[in-house]
């Protein structure tokens, strides 16, 4: 399913990761996991990669440890921003060692990058429909940025977009499961926008068990206690807490489907392609990136509400799990992701940093989807 790798000149690349989780994360952490997949693929392709991350990160690149461990897991850490400022100082002190610096920490570095005149690019991993971001990106409009879906761009269409690069994962890391299980899966984070209450409603309407593997941030504890916890008394619902990376394979691969009933403009949704990699179809609400990532009837079903989702569950036997896996291999591998980023790096290093119009912003692999 993979196309032949393009030949790129060997580059010296810095990857600058958030410090909240290790790279890769032990448990939850979509951004850090994607940074890991990208970093390891770039190393495999022969590039000289330096990773700025927490000290408990594991990589084949040169690791520059900033904090002793992931900040979310460090009970002694009271000011996470302080560690990120220290990281920026370290990154820019080594700027001459890199052909390009790839940031994954949103806009935190913008004032320094503007003044230091380094070749850089930033992947924006979060939602952009926040009013506070409008004046910030008006001021820093020249900063080259990458979107992780075309829908993510919509609130800020006129900034310096260099392309859309969908996330990718190693094709050999996720085993393909031939047969579907007898339960529905919910994986990720428990918060209002992730739609766990909707997932529970779907499972009750469908009469099929739901297994929930998800973390609860401190900010969402009240939501869990007030809204979700009372819904867990159903015999159809089992909450197993947060699970690690190896456990994900069996959890997703043995599920009948992944439920993704979000209520927000999801920038990407890594868990969707994790499920597809295991051959497990996804039943998702049509918000944010979902229509871009999903292929109706191949990787699952896009539905508008809980009743439609319950009806879709009856049609899961129409999904060919092998074709679901093949769809992942065609569009969402880490090799494809790395090549797309290398094309952007190459263009920026050559001084070609003009914005790419939205119609051209999706790289070639999205046009044939």
Question: Which stretches of residues belong to each language-model region?
Answer:
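Catalytic cores of nucleotide-sugar-dependent glycosyltransferases that transfer UDP/GDP/TDP-activated
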Residues: 2-369
């Amino acid at each position: 399913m993979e196309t032949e790798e393009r030949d790129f000149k060997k580059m010296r690349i810095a990857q600058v990761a958030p410090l909240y989780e290790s790279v890769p994360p032990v448990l939850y952490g979509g951004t850090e996991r994607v940074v890991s997949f990208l970093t390891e693929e770039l190393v495999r392709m022969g590039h000289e990669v330096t990773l700025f991350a927490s000290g408990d990160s594991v990589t084949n690149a040169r690791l520059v440890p900033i904090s002793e461990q992931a900040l979310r897991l460090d009970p002694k850490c009271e000011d996470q921003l302080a560690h990120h400022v220290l990281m920026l100082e370290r990154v820019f002190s080594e700027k001459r060692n890199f052909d390009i610096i790839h940031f994954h920490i949103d806009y935190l570095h913008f004032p320094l990058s503007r003044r230091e005149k380094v070749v850089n690019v930033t992947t924006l991993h979060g939602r952009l429909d926040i009013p506070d971001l409008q004046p910030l990106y008006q001021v820093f409009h020249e900063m080259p940025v990458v979107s992780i879906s075309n829908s993510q761009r919509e609130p800020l269409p006129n900034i310096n977009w260099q392309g859309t690069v969908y996330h990718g994962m190693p094709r050999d890391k996720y085993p393909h499961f031939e047969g579907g299980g007898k339960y529905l899966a919910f994986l990720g984070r428990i918060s209002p926008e992730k739609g766990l209450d909707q997932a529970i409603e779907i499972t009750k309407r469908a009469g099929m068990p739901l297994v929930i593997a998800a973390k609860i941030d401190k900010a969402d504890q009240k939501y869990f206690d007030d809204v979700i916890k009372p819904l867990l008394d159903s015999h159809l619902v089992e909450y197993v807490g947060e699970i690690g990376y190896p456990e994900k394979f069996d959890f997703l691969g043995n599920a009948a489907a992944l439920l993704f009933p979000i209520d927000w403009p999801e920038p990407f949704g890594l868990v969707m392609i994790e499920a597809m990699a295991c051959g497990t179809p996804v039943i998702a609400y049509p918000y944010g990136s979902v229509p871009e990532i999903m292929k109706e009837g191949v990787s699952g079903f896009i539905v508008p509400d809980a009743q439609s989702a319950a009806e879709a569950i009856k049609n899961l036997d129409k999904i060919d799990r092998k074709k679901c896996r093949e769809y992942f291999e065609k569009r969402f591998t880490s090799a494809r992701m790395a090549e797309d980023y290398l094309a952007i790096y190459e263009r920026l290093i050559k001084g070609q940093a003009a914005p790419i119009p939205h119609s051209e912003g999706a790289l070639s692999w999205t046009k044939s989807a």
